[in-house]
């Protein structure tokens, strides 16, 4: 990367994770000129690099479901378009219920999915082992299987988006931190960076867990905070198949996926832990970073995982991971123009499901900014 950056641009995207690269890709592909993306360190170095990479199609609303489906189709098309690998495999997802209330919720999801032509199979208890042979179903009452869900490589997708964005004319500058966002009369004027100032008409802030503190410097409030997020990666299992579906066990706060012959066990625990003492002060140099292990916090969930997948009892832990993820109070994404500053847009707050959301979120940011440009 050259340190010589342009002095002006139409739009500056701040953040080189999967969300920022998706925004840059969509803007450039659909005709925006002078698109610049700035990344303080390397692409994916914030939280994208350690994401589990699950790709689910059903969201909590029609809008989120459409965004997720767009993401899935985009990632498939990008492989064909570029010949580069995104690591996408549609091995399906199995979600189980251990209570009748949960089963009723899953059945509602299956009905909801029909509106979007998403294939969902409702399963009786005795059908679940046919889908997931390693599972203990003693306490399971039923479930749903979504054949075209799957998983992908977050770094691979980001790199493909970045390369495609550059093919369409966007410029990407790594190791170029933003010192200050410049405003005038309540509107965006530009950015002051490590390598000089850039005048621009629009800014899209896609800086993940840094977004809150960056926006706070220009008195824009973004309700987002980083929590600790845990998973473990097992040693290889002989019994595991590469086509093993993603498994979700909401009653036990678990998700599991096959990972190169191993099993990744992640949790969304009821009482999460703040990742940093001051959520306005995420360290600027926190790149490819990990947080201290807290096995006592994770252990009860690991025990539940071993009950669910007994094969885990006889295999070691290759990696214990604790890293930050950005969450919002209502678990909704933060997308669109801020009320405080004109032409200042945000694309963040994906609540640890950024991989399956980023493709659609980038398209939404394109639509928002294009509408503004047409006014």
Walk through the language-model features, giving the residues of each.
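Conserved small/polar residues in nucleotide/adenosyl-binding loops
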Residues: 368-375
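Core beta-strand elements of the Rossmann-like FAD/NAD(P) dinucleotide-binding domain
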Residues: 7-9, 194-202
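Central helical "cap/lid" subdomain
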Residues: 200-243
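Helix-loop-beta segment of a Rossmann-like dinucleotide-binding subdomain
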Residues: 6, 86-95, 109, 129-168, ...
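Dinucleotide-binding Rossmann-like beta1-alpha1 core, especially the glycine-rich loop
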Residues: 53-131, 251-256, 260-264, 289
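Active-site lid/adjacent beta-loop-alpha segment flanking the redox-cofactor pocket in flavoenzymes
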Residues: 220-223, 236-343
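Helical element adjacent to the flavin cofactor pocket in flavoenzyme catalytic cores
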Residues: 148-198
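Glycine-rich FAD pyrophosphate-binding loop
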Residues: 29-47
């Amino acid at each position: 990367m050259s340190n010589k950056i342009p002095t002006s641009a139409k739009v500056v995207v701040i953040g080189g994770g999967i969300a920022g690269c998706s925004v840059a890709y969509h803007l450039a592909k659909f005709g925006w000129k002078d698109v610049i993306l700035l990344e303080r360190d390397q692409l994916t170095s914030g939280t994208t690099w350690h994401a589990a990479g699950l790709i689910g199609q059903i969201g909590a609303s029609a809008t989120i479901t459409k965004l997720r489906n767009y993401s899935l189709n985009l990632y498939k098309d990008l492989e064909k378009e570029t010949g580069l690998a995104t690591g996408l495999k549609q091995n399906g997802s199995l979600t189980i219920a251990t209570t009748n209330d949960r089963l009723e919720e899953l059945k509602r999801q299956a009905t909801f999915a029909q509106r979007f032509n998403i294939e969902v199979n409702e399963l009786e208890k005795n059908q679940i082992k046919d889908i997931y042979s390693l599972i203990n179903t003693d306490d399971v009452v039923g479930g749903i299987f979504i054949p075209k869900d799957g998983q992908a490589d977050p770094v691979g997708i980001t790199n493909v988006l970045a390369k495609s964005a550059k093919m369409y004319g966007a410029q990407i500058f790594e190791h170029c931190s933003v010192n200050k966002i410049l405003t005038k009369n309540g509107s965006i004027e530009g950015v002051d960076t490590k390598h000089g100032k850039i005048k621009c008409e629009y800014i899209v802030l896609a800086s993940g867990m840094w977004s809150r503190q960056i926006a706070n410097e220009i008195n824009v409030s973004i309700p987002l905070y980083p929590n600790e997020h845990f998973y473990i990666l097992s040693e290889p299992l002989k019994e595991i198949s590469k086509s093993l579906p993603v498994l979700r066990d909401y009653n036990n706060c678990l998700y599991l996926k096959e990972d190169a012959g191993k099993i990744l066990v992640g949790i969304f625990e009821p009482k999460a832990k703040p990742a940093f003492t001051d959520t306005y002060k995420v360290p600027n140099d926190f790149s490819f970073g990990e947080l201290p292990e807290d096995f006592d916090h994770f252990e009860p969930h690991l025990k539940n995982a071993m009950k669910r997948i007994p094969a885990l009892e006889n295999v070691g832990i290759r990696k214990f991971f604790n890293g930050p993820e950005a969450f919002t109070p209502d678990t909704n994404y933060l997308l669109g123009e801020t009320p405080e500053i004109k032409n200042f847009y945000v694309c963040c707050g994906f609540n640890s499901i950024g991989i399956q959301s980023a493709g659609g979120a980038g398209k939404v940011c394109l639509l928002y900014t294009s509408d503004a440009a047409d006014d």
